[in-house]
Amino acid sequence: MDAGHIPVLLHECIENLNIRPDGIYVDGTLGMGGHSEQIAGRLTTGTLIGIDRDETAIARAGARLAPFGDRVQLVHGNFRDTAAILDRLGIGAVDGMLFDLGVSSPQLDETQRGFSYMHDAPLDMRMDATSGLSAWNVVNEWPEGELKRILYEYGEERYAPRIAGAIVRARAQQPIATTLELVDVIRSAMPGAALREKQHPAKRSFQAIRIAVNDELAAVREMMDTAPDKLRVGGRLCVISFHSLEDRIVKTGIARREHGCTCPREAPVCTCGFVQTLRSVSRKPILPSEEELECNPRARSAKLRVAERV
């Protein structure tokens, strides 16, 4: 298999899901179906629900998972809506959930999707090609202040003001239509020292724009707010993140559900209504092994957090 399509932290996810042959499991970010294939292969009378916002991913994974027959159900949808999707399917509770966040390797590798700053393509970056907002809209239509905000908040780009200003000046001459046109604009805004750094100068900006186009951070928050409620007691939640913004949301979401009642100790009765619903299986995130990194360098920034329903 192409290294770009190797499922990240596969062994660790399967081990921590504690898969039961008769259980119900959710892969909320189906992608190429690598994680799902391993889950479905461990089911006898159980069911796997695979969700992805990318119709191309649904089609490809569907072919890969076809041998499992009706043990697998695939849904075109956003992982942020996992709880609602399960309700729609008439599924009250599940035994495990897996979410592999961020852009998938096939999306990066398919030049025309516009995710990569290494190849020329139309400015798109939509994970769901049926959605309206594209990178072209963000780059060419959003106000300078909003561009500066997303570059700083989502890309943690220290040159956000300079890059936002350069984008606005460039698009005033003519629309920025392709990925490499945008890369040129970003390069023009950065000082020489930044251009000599090991990291590609457009990496942070492309991340920021992609997150904005796909509303990725809000999606993670909504998932963490609602999806764990669909776990049975003892069911496991596995979330793989690839940058600190996602990981912070996941970590905070688990911690909030671990603490339970927030009322003062002296309060005679609980009035906040919060109860503990999760416990962390490991306090620190699980990281890829050196062996995995040798086979799949794209796994380098991956972090897996695991929690159990209580």
Model-derived features: where do they sit?
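S-adenosyl-L-methionine-dependent methyltransferase catalytic core, i.e., the SAM/SAH-binding region
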Residues: M1-V310
